[in-house]
């Protein structure tokens, strides 16, 4: 972060307090003594000073203005207001007389009654400023890599199994539980793509483990069973995934598992609370299908609990 403090000539103590705070946070900052007269005549300064000032303005990420009363809409003021507004930079205003013309307050940022009030706000919100700065840095990195910061782009890298790039999306502020444009959660995409490391990572960072896709209404665990992937199914079960979910077509998870007939997966679900008597729209349960299609290994598994 690069903070800029515009300060009036009579605001030395306030400026020192602000500088001390930024220094305590190990944040880069610079100070420009600038009252109304400075803003009115700065554009007439020599070429080198003007270049230095404009370079300073362009590298600024946050700005504090103290003692900025009676500023006329000079070329410099209009430039600063337009630049900071266009870049959506946080600007904090502390008028020396406690009152700032509306044209300035509305154009630039948030007004505080005095420096102590501003410092109180900064102390409270500084972790968020740091978080936002990190996100902006990651967004810039993704841009330079030619990677769009969109849910569909995120899902593409999830499906590829690219953990490093996927982590950048989350660091840039993307929600781990977000869905792509088709309505498929990232955890389901990772599962359907058989990307165990991505599934593990998404669970770890708090992705909604029971989120269902728009297409089939499958959760990640249902996708793991459908893909016949025991390792991912086991991971999801251990993470607390719901074992008795029902798909859009009315199929309970245990019915899907019985259809796949992977004894290892069926045993995993059954022993962790899978309901073998939960029926689909045909009125059939996992137990019923096992008997109908004479899947003896499943019949034995399901009957074992009765003994």
Protein language model annotation of sequence segments:
Residues 1-60:
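Conserved N-terminal substructure of TIR/SEFIR domains
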Residues 100-167:
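C-terminal interaction surface of TIR/SEFIR-family domains
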Residues 156-161, 189-195, 223-229, 256-262, ...:
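Ankyrin repeat A-helix N-terminal signature
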Residues 147, 180, 213-214, 247, ...:
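Ankyrin repeat boundary/linker residues
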Residues 69-86:
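Conserved TIR/SEFIR loop-to-helix hotspot centered on a Trp-containing motif
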Residues 162-170, 195-203, 229-237, 262-270, ...:
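Ankyrin repeat structural motif
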Residues 150, 183, 216-217, 250, ...:
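Start-of-repeat signature of ankyrin repeats
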């Amino acid at each position: 972060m690069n903070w800029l403090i515009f300060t009036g000539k009579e605001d030395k103590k306030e400026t020192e307090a602000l500088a001390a705070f930024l220094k305590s946070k190990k944040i880069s900052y610079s100070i420009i003594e600038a009252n109304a007269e400075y803003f009115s005549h700065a554009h007439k300064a020599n070429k080198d000073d003007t270049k230095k000032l404009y370079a300073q303005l362009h590298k600024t990420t946050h700005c504090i203005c103290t003692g900025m009363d009676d500023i006329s809409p000079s070329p410099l003021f209009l430039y600063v207001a337009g630049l900071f507004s266009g870049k959506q930079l946080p600007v904090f205003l502390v008028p020396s007389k406690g009152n700032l013309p509306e044209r300035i307050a509305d154009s630039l940022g948030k007004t505080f009654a005095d420096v102590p009030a501003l410092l109180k706000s900064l102390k409270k919100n500084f972790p968020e400023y740091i978080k936002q700065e990190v996100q902006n840095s990651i967004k810039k990195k993704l841009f330079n890599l030619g990677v769009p910061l969109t849910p569909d782009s995120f899902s593409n890298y999830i499906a590829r199994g690219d953990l490093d790039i996927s982590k950048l999306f989350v660091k840039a502020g993307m929600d781990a539980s977000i869905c792509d444009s088709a309505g498929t959660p990232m955890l389901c995409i990772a599962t359907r793509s058989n990307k165990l490391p991505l599934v593990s990572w998404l669970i770890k960072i708090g992705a909604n483990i029971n989120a269902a896709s728009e297409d089939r209404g499958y959760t990640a665990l249902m996708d793991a069973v459908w893909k016949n992937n025991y390792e991912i199914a086991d991971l999801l079960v251990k993470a607390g995934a719901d074992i008795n979910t029902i798909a859009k077509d009315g199929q309970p998870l245990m019915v899907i598992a019985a259809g796949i007939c992977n004894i290892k997966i069926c045993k995993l679900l059954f022993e962790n609370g899978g309901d073998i008597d939960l029926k689909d729209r045909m009125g059939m349960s996992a137990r019923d299908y096992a008997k109908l299609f004479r899947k003896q290994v499943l019949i034995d598994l399901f009957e074992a609990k009765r003994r």
